[in-house]
């Protein structure tokens, strides 16, 4: 599959596995899972033909590893980023001392005043490395990187989760735990 098709299919899956499963007539199971055959049939019924081989390619080749199959290969889900309520079954764990959050420069003043909020998602997304944060922030304009004092937040009682693709998740972050990387 060429790169453009890979991106289009990935975006289509993101939309329907993270935000609007009902638009395809899908109901996410606990953990955010949906049957592979059910997903492919729903896509086809909505005039979007995706083959099983293409689905596997998107899961394997997506640079952010947004999706994963269950151990049987019969179900698929988005690893994180849901705006619909989904319990991914992640276990709270101690985060690294610091994590990073990339954002566009035009968001900076509000974030430094109000902190990081999940917005339309269930969680704030954090990266273990600054390169990933920079890539995320650059999607919406000139990127800036915020350093998150994750261990301090954890010690203060805030829960952190690490998704299957290595993205750290938490609830809102007070600005006192944020610093602009210079």
UniProtKB/Swiss-Prot annotation:
Alphabetical keyword list: NAD, Transferase
Top-level taxonomic group: Bacteria
GO process terms (BP): tRNA splicing, via endonucleolytic cleavage and ligation
Similarity comment text for this entry: Belongs to the KptA/TPT1 family.
The protein's Enzyme Commission number: 2.7.1.-
Protein name (database record): Probable RNA 2'-phosphotransferase
Job of this protein: Removes the 2'-phosphate from RNA via an intermediate in which the phosphate is ADP-ribosylated by NAD followed by a presumed transesterification to release the RNA and generate ADP-ribose 1''-2''-cyclic phosphate (APPR>P). May function as an ADP-ribosylase.
Keyword NAD recorded: yes
Keyword tRNA processing in annotation: no
Molecular function GO terms recorded: NAD+ poly-ADP-ribosyltransferase activity; tRNA 2'-phosphotransferase activity
Pfam families, per the entry: PTS_2-RNA
């Amino acid at each position: 599959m060429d790169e453009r098709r890979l991106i289009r299919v990935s975006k289509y899956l993101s939309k329907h596995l993270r935000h609007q499963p009902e638009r395809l007539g899908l109901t996410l199971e606990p953990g955010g899972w949906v049957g592979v055959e059910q997903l492919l049939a729903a896509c086809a019924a909505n005039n979007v033909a995706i083959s099983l081989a293409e689905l596997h390619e998107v899961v394997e080749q997506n640079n952010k590893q947004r999706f994963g199959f269950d151990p049987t290969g019969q179900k698929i889900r988005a690893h994180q980023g849901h705006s619909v309520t989904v319990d991914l079954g992640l276990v709270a764990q101690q985060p690294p001392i610091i994590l990073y959050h990339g954002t566009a420069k035009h968001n900076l003043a509000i974030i430094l005043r109000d902190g990081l909020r999940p917005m339309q998602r269930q969680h704030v997304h954090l990266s273990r490395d600054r390169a990933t944060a920079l890539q995320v922030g650059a999607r919406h304009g000139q990127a800036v990187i915020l350093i998150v004092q994750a261990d301090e937040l954890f010690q203060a009682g805030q829960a952190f989760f690490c998704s299957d693709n290595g993205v750290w998740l938490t609830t809102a972050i007070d600005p006192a735990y944020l610093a602009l990387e210079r």
